[in-house]
């Protein structure tokens, strides 16, 4: 198969993914065992060796950067960001990083049981059966309910507690009232679920015993007809005096109301009382509940799980925006052919059967390591090769493809051979900074080829 045909098939894969033609300039088509160390186009020289075909120019990299930003749904790259090492010490980014690692490790393997209290429920739980990935301090960082929500959502956003000029403390006790800025949530996102996470450290409390049970309740703060505060209960969770770890409370109804009417966002209030004394509120500090003045890694935070609109836009739409950008940012290109910009070579290899090849896009080469946290690059892979008779078992051929191959042998001019195409696709999670306060995790479905076959 010729280098030209291999590249054409790679273009077809990229076009089907909505990435556009220009992203081809940023891929490395290498066998899985080979790692590209420089951005450019790599080809097989016919001797099972991968060689550099063309180095990316600065203009190429600029085009690629525009394409990836549009692909991520971001108007422009974030600037003036703190280092990952500093930002990832905070509780909310650490949660998303944990989610990212779980998605990459378990993609395609998470079949969750039904949960009656999943969407917009009023009951929350502690999920004490979760394994302790980072020791006792990070108990229940990712719960079974989270795993279900992760599977159902495309976008996961975290919100750290912030001080708002219109938010006063209630009942003169610091730490009970929290406020989250949700103004960055796009209007076309559908809310699947929202959770509040607060950290309990029994070693900091008064009652270090399992015999003392407490109920933690979270309320949405509203404004009554006379301008007075109202409190609508959202959910509750029971805990004990000796518990150390994260508590999870469902706040879906609260976040939904704030997204519909932003002026109604007056924050939430956290109440606590002994199970046997519901009429008497206890201090949060007495049961070791951590409030907003503690270390970054134990700060309370809110998680929003969303279903976004189609995240990968049509190629035609992408091309339209590229044309507009070209008009507003004209760049002169050299017309002469240089060693780094030559036509694709003629075929140097024999025809190969349908198989998976490596297609790699390196984010780090664009200088985006300061805002894209993970991954460093995009290993998409693509399907390439012929579907010739006989179709072997490793070609994953459908019954129809087998029949079509036989008919092609009889009528080669009337019936084409089956096509080499993906048979299984996986998701690509991307973790990135919006700014110093917000980190997003987007999951792009059907972005990574897992296997190929003849169809």
Curated annotation (Swiss-Prot):
<dbReference type="InterPro" id="IPR029034">
    <property type="entry name" value="Cystine-knot_cytokine"/>
</dbReference>
<keyword id="KW-0202">Cytokine</keyword>
<keyword id="KW-0964">Secreted</keyword>
<dbReference type="GO" id="GO:0046928">
    <property type="term" value="P:regulation of neurotransmitter secretion"/>
</dbReference>
<dbReference type="GO" id="GO:0050806">
    <property type="term" value="P:positive regulation of synaptic transmission"/>
</dbReference>
<comment type="function">
    <text>Required for the growth of imaginal tissues and for patterning of the adult wing.</text>
</comment>
<dbReference type="InterPro" id="IPR017948">
    <property type="entry name" value="TGFb_CS"/>
</dbReference>
<dbReference type="GO" id="GO:0008586">
    <property type="term" value="P:imaginal disc-derived wing vein morphogenesis"/>
</dbReference>
<dbReference type="InterPro" id="IPR001111">
    <property type="entry name" value="TGF-b_propeptide"/>
</dbReference>
<dbReference type="Pfam" id="PF00688">
    <property type="entry name" value="TGFb_propeptide"/>
</dbReference>
<keyword id="KW-1015">Disulfide bond</keyword>
<dbReference type="InterPro" id="IPR015615">
    <property type="entry name" value="TGF-beta-rel"/>
</dbReference>
<feature type="compositionally biased region" description="Acidic residues">
    <location>
        <begin position="108"/>
        <end position="118"/>
    </location>
</feature>
<feature type="compositionally biased region" description="Basic residues">
    <location>
        <begin position="318"/>
        <end position="336"/>
    </location>
</feature>
<dbReference type="GO" id="GO:0045887">
    <property type="term" value="P:positive regulation of synaptic assembly at neuromuscular junction"/>
</dbReference>
<dbReference type="GO" id="GO:0007274">
    <property type="term" value="P:neuromuscular synaptic transmission"/>
</dbReference>
<feature type="disulfide bond">
    <location>
        <begin position="383"/>
        <end position="452"/>
    </location>
</feature>
<dbReference type="GO" id="GO:0030707">
    <property type="term" value="P:follicle cell of egg chamber development"/>
</dbReference>
<feature type="region of interest" description="Disordered">
    <location>
        <begin position="316"/>
        <end position="345"/>
    </location>
</feature>
<dbReference type="GO" id="GO:0031045">
    <property type="term" value="C:dense core granule"/>
</dbReference>
<feature type="signal peptide">
    <location>
        <begin position="1"/>
        <end position="36"/>
    </location>
</feature>
<dbReference type="InterPro" id="IPR001839">
    <property type="entry name" value="TGF-b_C"/>
</dbReference>
<dbReference type="GO" id="GO:0007528">
    <property type="term" value="P:neuromuscular junction development"/>
</dbReference>
<dbReference type="GO" id="GO:0007391">
    <property type="term" value="P:dorsal closure"/>
</dbReference>
<dbReference type="GO" id="GO:0035222">
    <property type="term" value="P:wing disc pattern formation"/>
</dbReference>
<dbReference type="GO" id="GO:0005160">
    <property type="term" value="F:transforming growth factor beta receptor binding"/>
</dbReference>
<comment type="similarity">
    <text>Belongs to the TGF-beta family.</text>
</comment>
<keyword id="KW-0339">Growth factor</keyword>
<feature type="disulfide bond">
    <location>
        <begin position="387"/>
        <end position="454"/>
    </location>
</feature>
<keyword id="KW-0732">Signal</keyword>
<dbReference type="GO" id="GO:0007474">
    <property type="term" value="P:imaginal disc-derived wing vein specification"/>
</dbReference>
<dbReference type="GO" id="GO:2000736">
    <property type="term" value="P:regulation of stem cell differentiation"/>
</dbReference>
<dbReference type="GO" id="GO:0048557">
    <property type="term" value="P:embryonic digestive tract morphogenesis"/>
</dbReference>
<dbReference type="GO" id="GO:0016015">
    <property type="term" value="F:morphogen activity"/>
</dbReference>
<feature type="glycosylation site" description="N-linked (GlcNAc...) asparagine">
    <location>
        <position position="238"/>
    </location>
</feature>
<keyword id="KW-0217">Developmental protein</keyword>
<keyword id="KW-0165">Cleavage on pair of basic residues</keyword>
<dbReference type="GO" id="GO:0005125">
    <property type="term" value="F:cytokine activity"/>
</dbReference>
<dbReference type="GO" id="GO:0012505">
    <property type="term" value="C:endomembrane system"/>
</dbReference>
<dbReference type="GO" id="GO:0045202">
    <property type="term" value="C:synapse"/>
</dbReference>
<dbReference type="Pfam" id="PF00019">
    <property type="entry name" value="TGF_beta"/>
</dbReference>
<feature type="propeptide">
    <location>
        <begin position="37"/>
        <end position="335"/>
    </location>
</feature>
């Amino acid at each position: 198969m010729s280098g030209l045909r291999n590249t054409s098939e790679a273009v077809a894969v990229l076009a089907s993914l909505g990435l556009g033609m220009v992203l081809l300039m940023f891929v490395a088509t290498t066998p899985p065992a080979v790692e590209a160390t420089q951005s450019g186009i790599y080809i097989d020289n016919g001797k099972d060796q991968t060689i550099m075909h063309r180095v990316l120019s600065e203009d190429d990299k600029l085009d690629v950067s525009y394409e990836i930003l549009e692909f991520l749904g971001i108007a422009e790259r974030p600037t003036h960001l703190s280092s990952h090492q500093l930002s990832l010490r905070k509780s909310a980014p650490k949660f998303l990083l944990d989610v990212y690692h779980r998605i990459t490790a378990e993609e395609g393997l998470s079949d969750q049981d039904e949960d009656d209290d999943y969407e917009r429920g009023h009951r929350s739980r502690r999920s004490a059966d979760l394994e302790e990935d980072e020791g006792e301090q990070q108990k229940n960082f990712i719960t079974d309910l989270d795993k279900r929500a992760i599977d159902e959502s495309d976008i996961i956003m975290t919100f750290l507690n912030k001080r708002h000029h219109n938010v006063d403390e209630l009942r003169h006790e610091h730490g009970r009232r929290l406020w989250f800025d949700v103004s960055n949530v796009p209007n076309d996102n559908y809310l699947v679920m929202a959770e509040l996470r607060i950290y309990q450290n029994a070693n900091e409390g008064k009652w270090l015993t399992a015999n003392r049970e407490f109920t933690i309740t979270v309320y949405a703060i509203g404004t009554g007809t006379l301008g007075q505060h109202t409190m609508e209960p959202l959910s509750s969770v029971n805990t004990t005096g000796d518990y150390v770890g994260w508590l999870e409370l469902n706040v879906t109804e609260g976040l939904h109301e704030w997204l519909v009417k932003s002026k109604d966002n007056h924050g939430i209030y956290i109440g606590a009382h002994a199970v046997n004394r519901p009429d008497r509120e206890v201090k949060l500090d007495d049961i070791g509940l951590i409030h907003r003045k503690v270390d970054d890694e134990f700060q309370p935070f809110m998680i929003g799980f969303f279903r976004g609109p189609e995240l990968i836009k049509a190629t035609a739409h992408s091309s339209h925006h590229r044309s507009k950008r070209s008009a507003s940012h004209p760049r002169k290109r050299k017309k002469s052919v240089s060693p780094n910009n030559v036509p694709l070579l003629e075929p140097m290899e024999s025809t190969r059967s349908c198989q998976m090849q490596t297609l790699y896009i390196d984010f780090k080469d664009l200088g985006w390591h300061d805002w894209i946290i993970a991954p460093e690059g995009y290993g998409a892979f693509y399907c390439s090769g012929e579907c010739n008779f006989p179709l072997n078992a490793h070609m994953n051929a459908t019954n129809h493809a087998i029949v079509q191959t036989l008919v092609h042998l009889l009528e080669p001019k009337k019936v084409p051979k089956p096509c080499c195409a993906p048979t299984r696709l996986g998701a690509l999670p991307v973790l990135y900074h919006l700014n110093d306060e917000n980190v997003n995790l987007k999951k792009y479905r059907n972005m990574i080829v897992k296997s190929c076959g003849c169809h």
